[in-house]
Amino acid sequence: MAASLGGMFTGQPPGPPPPPPGLPGQASLLQAAPGAPRPSNSTLVDELESSFEACFASLVSQDYVNGTDQEEIRTGVDQCIQKFLDIARQTECFFLQKRLQLSVQKPDQVIKEDVSELRSELQRKDALVQKHLTKLRHWQQVLEDINVQHKKPADMPQGSLAFLEQASANIPAPLKQT
């Protein structure tokens, strides 16, 4: 499958050292094309991983802790991050090309995936609507309970003095201190 890429990433600087041997069953989906300047058993994913690790290694490097120039530290970190971003773009490009090939070779598969994504989005939104409806019903019930409580005082005596007496009856008495 990777051989069909035929020099897709030519002109790229040599990658990091290959991963340690002895990783059986490792996917070679992103294996570099013949003639590319990568090590023979390195893949885009391996390079992405090693460049990510190099970003962290440059941040915690003992060389930087021992009083190296700030500009030198910044330059080293920027280079590591730029390399990581370049390899990430290459990896994204690879997957976009595979997606394009799939859409050309099997357009019905792409439509099925789109329909599946739309269905899952509808289910997610339906669940969100149900959640909001539940909250709405709860608050409607709270408001209804408040309205019922305010309608009950109609049988109480009218007037400002009666209202103050009723309001003060609901205030707890102060505790006596000894």
Swiss-Prot record:
Family: Belongs to the Mediator complex subunit 28 family.
Transcription found in the keyword field: yes
Protein species of origin: Mus musculus (Mouse)
Any coiled-coil regions, as ranges: 109-145
A single GO BP: positive regulation of transcription initiation by RNA polymerase II
Assembly mode: Component of the Mediator complex, which is composed of MED1, MED4, MED6, MED7, MED8, MED9, MED10, MED11, MED12, MED13, MED13L, MED14, MED15, MED16, MED17, MED18, MED19, MED20, MED21, MED22, MED23, MED24, MED25, MED26, MED27, MED29, MED30, MED31, CCNC, CDK8 and CDC2L6/CDK11. The MED12, MED13, CCNC and CDK8 subunits form a distinct module termed the CDK8 module. Mediator containing the CDK8 module is less active than Mediator lacking this module in supporting transcriptional activation.
Function: Component of the Mediator complex, a coactivator involved in the regulated transcription of nearly all RNA polymerase II-dependent genes. Mediator functions as a bridge to convey information from gene-specific regulatory proteins to the basal RNA polymerase II transcription machinery. Mediator is recruited to promoters by direct interactions with regulatory proteins and serves as a scaffold for the assembly of a functional preinitiation complex with RNA polymerase II and the general transcription factors.
Keywords: Actin-binding, Activator, Coiled coil, Cytoplasm, Membrane, Nucleus, Transcription, Transcription regulation
GO MF term set: actin binding
Cellular compartment(s): Nucleus; Cytoplasm; Membrane
Gene Ontology CC: one annotated term: core mediator complex
Region Disordered, residue ranges: 1-43
Protein's name in the database: Mediator of RNA polymerase II transcription subunit 28
Domain of life: Eukaryota
Originating gene: Med28
Main location per the UniProt record: nucleus
Membrane spanning stretches: none
UniProt-listed InterPro entries: Mediator_Med28
Bias (Pro residues): 13-23
